[in-house]
Amino acid sequence: MSLNAEIKASIVADNARCANDTGSPEVQVALLTAQINHLQGHFKEHAKDHHGRRGLLRMVSQRRKLLDYLKRKDVQRYAALIAKLGLRR
């Protein structure tokens, strides 16, 4: 159910602030967004997977916390990330 290494590497490369950046909020939010989008397809097929849904809600909460942090620290980076990922806020 996880993303493979090639997909993760491309997401990190697209959202990194510098060459070796893997832990910035932008990269973390992009990885969580990809994982959340991947799991949404799973839950269309397996609606009664409540244990997995709990993990999904945890990821959504973590993404929300990271976005709130980024908005508090740097509004321009926050707005650019939201536009790039196509999130609603």
From Swiss-Prot:
One of the GO BP terms on file: translation
SMART domains the UniProt entry points to: Ribosomal_S15
Classification via Gene3D superfamilies: 6.10.250.3130, S15/NS1, RNA-binding
Annotated transmembrane regions: none
Top-level division of the source organism's lineage: Bacteria
Annotated SUPFAM superfamilies: S15/NS1 RNA-binding domain
Keywords: Ribonucleoprotein, Ribosomal protein, RNA-binding, rRNA-binding
Cross-referenced Pfam families: Ribosomal_S15
Gene Ontology MF terms: rRNA binding; structural constituent of ribosome
A single cellular component GO annotation: cytosolic small ribosomal subunit
Record keyword Kinase present: no
Family statement drawn from the similarity comment of this UniProt entry: Belongs to the universal ribosomal protein uS15 family.
NCBIfam families with a match to the protein in the record: S15_bact (TIGR00952)
Physiological role: One of the primary rRNA binding proteins, it binds directly to 16S rRNA where it helps nucleate assembly of the platform of the 30S subunit by binding and bridging several RNA helices of the 16S rRNA.
Quaternary structure (record): Part of the 30S ribosomal subunit. Forms a bridge to the 50S subunit in the 70S ribosome, contacting the 23S rRNA.
HAMAP family: Ribosomal_uS15_B
Stated name of the protein: Small ribosomal subunit protein uS15
Name of the gene encoding the protein in the UniProt record: rpsO
